[in-house]
């Protein structure tokens, strides 16, 4: 199983039914709509739009369980579904407000390796790829082999909590606060290049469409630039979450 928990405001039984029991109904979208004039809420990174993101969990799990306790409530509720046969909601025990999601990962098949999602390296990699710039820390219990202090030449497993995401994207920082070395280091880590970029463009646009952009022009073209397999496009993020790895429509071909 994979267990994900938070210490947020949680959900009541009715909210579980409305938000998780109804496909294509986005609780995040409704939350933003209802609080459109609240500046504090506007500053919260919420990206939900279409009400289907949660259901992607069934791509790797044959059963999903959500235990949630709303802030200020005395009772918690448990939502359980196997995807195809509807869902059940019942009262349960939970000490603190917040939500806890348990994914019962599918068995491996001839064509699909589901067990890889139970490996800490895979989870770490996915978080860094899609959620590295979410403003809240994503913490995971990580296991490491360390030398046994009592037995020479032997190792023991040590478990510690580690924050996986960096939280602050470079493009959201003020340009005046960023040194050239920071731009170069970010580029090298992000795009696996040993060389510094030839040029950096860091800009911010405000208006009907508001966005931050950080563009790097490399010293050398990609190795497959002249091949048919070359895929153009920029990485597109929304509130720190990677939406598209190669968005071809952000720039014209030239």
Question: At which residue positions do the language-model features occur?
Answer:
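GHKL/Bergerat-fold ATPase module in large chromosome/replication-associated machines
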Residues: 46, 67-86, 106-254
